[in-house]
C-alpha cells in the first residue's frame, strides 16, 4: 500500500526481551495469550468512529489466529486511553491481560488519518512495538490489519498474514449453479465479484505481485481459455488457448514462468510456459495423468500428482523435469499438492476408502520426506475437503469444505481455514457458496 507512510518510532520504543514466551505455532495447541485492545483515543467524531471500527478488526484478526484471546472491554479497569501516557500495568494484570494495545487516531488537514499504536507487555511493563500510519479513510481496514500483523509478528516471531486477499470461485445457492470469480479480504470482508457468471470459471490464481489473477474460463463446453485480469484497472486479456487444460497455471517465484497440466491423446502432462515468449516446455512423459503442479519457493523444484504407478501419488522433480522422486507412500489417492511459502511442508488432498465410503482429507508432509518417513500428518477430514492453499507465512491452510445434497436441498461448499497443527478450524464467511481459494501474499 504505497500511500501508507511508515514512521518507525525507533527513539521511543525499546524492544528488549520480555516476559512473554514467544508462541511456537508448530508444536501443538497452546493456550491463547490474553490481550487487551484498548479504545483508540480520537480527536474528533470521525476519528472516533474509525478508531472504534479498527479496534474491532484488530481484535478479530488476533482472535481468528487462535493464538490470542482478546479481553472484553467491559472488564477494563483503567479508563485512560491513547499513547501519551504510561499504562497502570497493575490494573491490566488484574484482569489477566498479558498484552495491552493502546492507540490513537487523528484526522489530518489532508483528509487522511494518522493512526498510532503501542504494544505493551504488562508483566515486564515494557513497550514491545509501535508504529504510526497515515492512510486515506477508505484504507482504514488495511491499516488495522497491518497493526494486527505487527502484533502477531512481535509475539510469534513469524510474519503476519492479515493484510492479504483471497480469490475464489463463488457459487450461487440455486440450481443450476452460477460460478463467478470473487475477491475478498482474508477474513471475508470487502467481497467483490470479478466475472459476470455467464461462463464456467475455475481455479483462480494470483500472480506473484497479487495485483493480477489468472483463471480458466470455458467459453464453450470443450474450449477452455486462460484469462489474465488486472485487479487495479479491471482489464482482462486471454493468455492462451490451451486445449485440454483443466486448471489455471501456477507461477514461478520470479513471475517469469508458470506450470500447468494439459490433456492430450489420453494422457495429461505438466508443461512450463515462458510468460514472455509464450513457449511451452513439456516436463513429464510416458502414459498417465500428471496434474496440479506447484513450484517450491525457490523455483528449483515442482511437486505434482501422477497415477503413473496406478494410484495418484505425489512426486517432486526439478523444474526442468529431471530427477523425479515419489514422496507419498500412504494408502489412498493424493491430489492438489501445494508447497508452503516457507518451503518446509507440502499440503495435499488425500482420498481414502472404507466401509463408510470415501473420505476426503487435508494433510501436510515434509518437503523432504526422506528426512522423516512418517512425516505425513492429516489435519482435517470430511465428506469433501480439498484445494488447500497456504497463508503467506506458511502457518495457516485455507481449503474448500463441502456437504452432500439432502432431500431437495443441494449440496454446498464453503471456505475454511485451519492451522498447520490441525487446530483452530474456522469458516471464512462468504455471501454464497465458495470453493477453490487462493491466498495472496502480504499486500504492499
Curated annotation (Swiss-Prot):
Pfam families xrefs: PD40, TolB_N
Keywords: Cell cycle, Cell division, Periplasm, Signal
InterPro entries in alphabetical order: 6-blade_b-propeller_TolB-like, PD40, Tol-Pal_TolB, TolB_N
Subcellular location per the Swiss-Prot or TrEMBL entry: Periplasm
Domain of life: Bacteria
Signal peptide: 1-19
Example GO BP: protein import
GO CC, one annotated term: periplasmic space
Function: Part of the Tol-Pal system, which plays a role in outer membrane invagination during cell division and is important for maintaining outer membrane integrity.
The family this protein is said to belong to: Belongs to the TolB family.
Assembly description: The Tol-Pal system is composed of five core proteins: the inner membrane proteins TolA, TolQ and TolR, the periplasmic protein TolB and the outer membrane protein Pal. They form a network linking the inner and outer membranes and the peptidoglycan layer.
PANTHER family, per database record: PROTEIN TOLB, PROTEIN TOLB HOMOLOG
Protein name: Tol-Pal system protein TolB
Amino acid at each position: 500500500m504505497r500511500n501508507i507512510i511508515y514512521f518507525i518510532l525507533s527513539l521511543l520504543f525499546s524492544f528488549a526481551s520480555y516476559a512473554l514466551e514467544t508462541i511456537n505455532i508448530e508444536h501443538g495447541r497452546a493456550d491463547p495469550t490474553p490481550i487487551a485492545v484498548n479504545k483508540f483515543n480520537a480527536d474528533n467524531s470521525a476519528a472516533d468512529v474509525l478508531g472504534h471500527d479498527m479496534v474491532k478488526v484488530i481484535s478479530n484478526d488476533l482472535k481468528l489466529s487462535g493464538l490470542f484471546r482478546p479481553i472484553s472491554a467491559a472488564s477494563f479497569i483503567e479508563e485512560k486511553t491513547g499513547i501519551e501516557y504510561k499504562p497502570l500495568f497493575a490494573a491490566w494484570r488484574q484482569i489477566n491481560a498479558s498484552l495491552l494495545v493502546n492507540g490513537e487516531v487523528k484526522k489530518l488537514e489532508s483528509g487522511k488519518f494518522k493512526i498510532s499504536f503501542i504494544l505493551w507487555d504488562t508483566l515486564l511493563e515494557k513497550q514491545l512495538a509501535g508504529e504510526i500510519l497515515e492512510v486515506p479513510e477508505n484504507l482504514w481496514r488495511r491499516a488495522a490489519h497491518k497493526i494486527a500483523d505487527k502484533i502477531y509478528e512481535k509475539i510469534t516471531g513469524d510474519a503476519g498474514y492479515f493484510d492479504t486477499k483471497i480469490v475464489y470461485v463463488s457459487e450461487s445457492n440455486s440450481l443450476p449453479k452460477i460460478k463467478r470469480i470473487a475477491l475478498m479480504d482474508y477474513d471475508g470482508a470487502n467481497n467483490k465479484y470479478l466475472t459476470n457468471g455467464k461462463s464456467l470459471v475455475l481455479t483462480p490464481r494470483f500472480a506473484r505481485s497479487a495485483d493480477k489473477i489468472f483463471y480458466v474460463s470455458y467459453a464453450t463446453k470443450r474450449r477452455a481459455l486462460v484469462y489474465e485480469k488486472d485487479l487495479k484497472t479491471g482489464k482482462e486479456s486471454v493468455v492462451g488457448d490451451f486445449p485440454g487444460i483443466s486448471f489455471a497455471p501456477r507461477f514461478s517465484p520470479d513471475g517469469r514462468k508458470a506450470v500447468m497440466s494439459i490433456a492430450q491423446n489420453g494422457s495429461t502432462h505438466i508443461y512450463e510456459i515462458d510468460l514472455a515468449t509464450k513457449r511451452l516446455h513439456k516436463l513429464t512423459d510416458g502414459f498417465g495423468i500428471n496434474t496440479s503442479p506447484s513450484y517450491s519457493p525457490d523455483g528449483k523444484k515442482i511437486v505434482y500428482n501422477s497415477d503413473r504407478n496406478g494410484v495418484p501419488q505425489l512426486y517432486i522433480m526439478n523444474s526442468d523435469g529431471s530427477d523425479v522422486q515419489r514422496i507419498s507412500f500412504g494408502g489412498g489417492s493424493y491430489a492438489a499438492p501445494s508447497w508452503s511459502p516457507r518451503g518446509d511442508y507440502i499440503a495435499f488432498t488425500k482420498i481414502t476408502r472404507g466401509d463408510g465410503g470415501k473420505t476426503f482429507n487435508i494433510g501436510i508432509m515434509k518437503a523432504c520426506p526422506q528426512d522423516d518417513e512418517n512425516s505425513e500428518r492429516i489435519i482435517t477430514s470430511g465428506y469433501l475437503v480439498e484445494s488447500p492453499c497456504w497463508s503467506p507465512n506458511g502457518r495457516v491452510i485455507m481449503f474448500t469444505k463441502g456437504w452432500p445434497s439432502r432431500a431437495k436441498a443441494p449440496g454446498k461448499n464453503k471456505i475454511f481455514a485451519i492451522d498447520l497443527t490441525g487446530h483452530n478450524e474456522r469458516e471464512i464467511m462468504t455471501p454464497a457458496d465458495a470453493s477453490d481459494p487462493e491466498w495472496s501474499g502480504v499486500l504492499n
